[in-house]
């Protein structure tokens, strides 16, 4: 389930105690973490980063942890869940998957999947037909889907057949490496309640409309229209038919979301919470202040600038957990920007920009050591079998003088503290490059999310270093949902492409961290980067087993810089959990930022 926006999951699990004045009313501090509760757990979210899409076939900007891990996947479980199982963090999480492990045959062109016995909340069995329903809707509306890459899923499926209620057979257009296909393609399958959703209007009776292209389009458009009516989420009967551990009780556009256990959940364990509540905070500082004041939150996030207060939290009875999250951070640069697209298409400019990121300094002072450098497309922590020595070596270390030399060698008049200008237009080895006219200035506009103080420090440092090299970086701030909304595939000259760069916090990678969906042509949300060589190398990681092809891809992307690498804040290191929260192991040890509240309970 690798995704451009499944990255910075700045939610914290926060468990509320029942105070007589309300869920978040002030409670007196007793020197221990809040221990009384009424079975209500609160997940803290950031205003502007809350769930705003309930339909599991999501567009690119809607692929966020707030929509998926913290919302949709609690109600609509993926068929196969990869990653996050304690002790087997990079494998199939069999306990919460709705099917057994896929079986490959016929030279890895045929996949057979056996469904487990799960039921929808209305008592109807979850069957292979619910999977083909999802596939039919997706195939007919694939250009809407945020995970779609031409030639990949669903294009690489020749047929998908419900052999019987419990057996799904998928025939592929060619052989694929099973590890890649299972973790990056099959993990996208989400059974949908065909018996309740296969209709074209609120008054129509469910049928088999999805089995024709036009019918699938009509059903999809109806469901999408209902999903766009966010004010009706809790009252619309469509969204009450779920197979996950929770169902929706109430929803507000401000970000207040209440979920309650699905009493018909077929998986194990059964939810023991009375209610799961999501409440937005204006900032991490506001959340942390509430935590320190013991106002009802018994778990939360420690902002990077407040890590010195961890001993005080421990004295209050909290436990700190420190599992690294498996991701990397970056500035998305827009190769089709009317202002900067031709600049970004020059490797030497991308190299110069990367040399202006002082990652060791940002890790130490911006995040107080609570971050990992990003040097390429594979996370450096936790350790995995996919990281090469080349990427670990930091190919572009911080050096303002190296950045200046690169620009000078390619036809730029470098003006430290001023603004560099192109004085040698053209395509020769000493020229500025194609599309860059004489007099063009190195001026970039970058939008970023200031949710964590560390982000602002990091971006200010980058701006200052760029200024030293004569590059004008103009920074502006925006909320997470606002930023991700502007980063889709676009054409140069279109209004949708009128942005230079954004930084929203990075991405959590999947268990097999290939570049599909990130660095191949037409990848959603990643700045319109396109390289035939990258496409070939990414395809090789999909078709060929083993790691040698993967290492070639990784080294190429680390060298080519389709984005500007930035430090990845380790959100797992700065979390605290009250001692009376049970069943938190899967969340605590999960490097992929998943949430498993069906395991939670309260105890002494």
Where are these regions (language model features)?
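Periplasmic-binding protein-like
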Residues: 55, 343-384, 394-410, 458, ...
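Aromatic- and charge-enriched surface segment that lines or borders ligand/interaction sites
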Residues: 100-145, 163, 169-171, 287-293, ...
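Surface-exposed binding/hinge segments that line
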Residues: 150-223
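Structural transition elements
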Residues: 246, 340, 373-429, 449-457, ...
């Amino acid at each position: 389930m690798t995704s451009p926006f499944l990255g910075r999951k700045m939610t914290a699990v926060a468990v509320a105690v029942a105070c007589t004045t309300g869920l978040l009313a002030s409670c007196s501090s007793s020197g221990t973490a809040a221990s009384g509760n009424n079975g209500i757990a609160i997940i803290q979210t950031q205003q502007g980063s809350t769930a705003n899409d309930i339909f599991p076939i999501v567009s690119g900007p809607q692929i966020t942890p707030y929509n998926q891990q913290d919302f949709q996947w609690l109600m609509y479980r993926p068929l196969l869940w990869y990653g996050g199982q304690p002790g087997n963090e990079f494998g199939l999480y069999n306990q919460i998957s709705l099917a057994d492990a896929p079986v490959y045959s016929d030279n890895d062109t045929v996949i057979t999947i056996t469904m487990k016995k799960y039921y929808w909340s209305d008592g109807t069995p979850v069957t292979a037909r619910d999977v083909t329903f999802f596939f039919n809707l997706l195939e007919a509306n694939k250009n809407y889907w945020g995970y779609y890459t031409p030639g990949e899923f669903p294009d690489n499926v020749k047929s998908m057949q419900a052999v019987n209620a419990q057996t799904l057979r998928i025939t592929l257009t060619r052989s694929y490496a099973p590890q890649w296909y299972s973790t990056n393609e099959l993990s996208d399958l989400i059974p949908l309640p065909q018996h309740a959703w296969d209709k074209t209007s609120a008054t129509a009776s469910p049928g088999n409309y999805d089995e024709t292209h036009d019918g699938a389009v009509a059903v999809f458009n109806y469901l999408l229209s209902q999903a766009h009516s966010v004010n009706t989420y809790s009252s619309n009967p469509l969204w009450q038919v779920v197979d996950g551990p929770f169902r929706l009780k109430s929803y507000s556009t401000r970000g207040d979301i209440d979920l309650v256990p699905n009493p018909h959940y077929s998986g194990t364990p059964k939810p023991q919470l009375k209610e799961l509540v999501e409440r937005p905070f204006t900032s991490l500082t506001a959340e942390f202040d509430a935590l320190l004041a013991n106002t009802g939150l018994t778990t939360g996030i420690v902002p990077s600038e407040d890590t010195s207060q961890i001993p005080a939290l421990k004295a209050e009875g909290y436990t700190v957990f420190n599992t690294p999250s498996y991701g990397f951070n970056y500035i998305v640069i827009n190769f089709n920007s009317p202002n900067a697209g031709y600049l970004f298409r020059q490797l030497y400019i991308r190299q110069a920009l990367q040399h202006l990121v002082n990652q060791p300094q940002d890790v130490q002072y911006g995040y107080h050591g609570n971050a990992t450098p990003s040097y390429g497309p594979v996370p450096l922590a936790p350790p995995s079998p996919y990281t090469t020595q080349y990427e670990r070596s930091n190919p572009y270390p911080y050096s303002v003088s190296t950045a200046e030399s690169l620009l000078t060698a390619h036809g730029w008049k470098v003006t430290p503290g001023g603004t560099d200008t192109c004085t040698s237009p053209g395509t020769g080895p000493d020229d500025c490059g194609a599309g860059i006219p004489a007099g063009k200035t190195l001026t970039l506009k970058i939008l970023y999310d200031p949710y964590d103080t560390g982000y602002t420090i990091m971006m200010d440092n980058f701006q200052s270093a760029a200024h030293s090299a004569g590059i004008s970086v103009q920074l502006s701030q925006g909320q997470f949902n606002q930023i991700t909304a502007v980063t889709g595939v676009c054409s140069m000259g279109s209004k949708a492409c009128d942005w230079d760069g954004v930084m929203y916090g990075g991405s959590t990678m999947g268990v097999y961290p290939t570049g599909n969906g990130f660095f191949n042509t037409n990848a959603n949300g990643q700045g319109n980067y396109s390289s035939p060589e990258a496409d070939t190398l990414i395809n090789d990681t999909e078709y060929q087993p083993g790691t040698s092809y993967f290492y070639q891809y990784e080294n190429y992307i680390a060298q080519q810089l389709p984005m500007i690498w930035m430090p990845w804040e380790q959100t797992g290191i700065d979390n605290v959990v009250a001692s009376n929260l049970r069943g938190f192991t899967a969340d605590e040890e999960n490097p992929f930022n998943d949430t498993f509240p069906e395991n939670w309970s309260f105890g002494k």
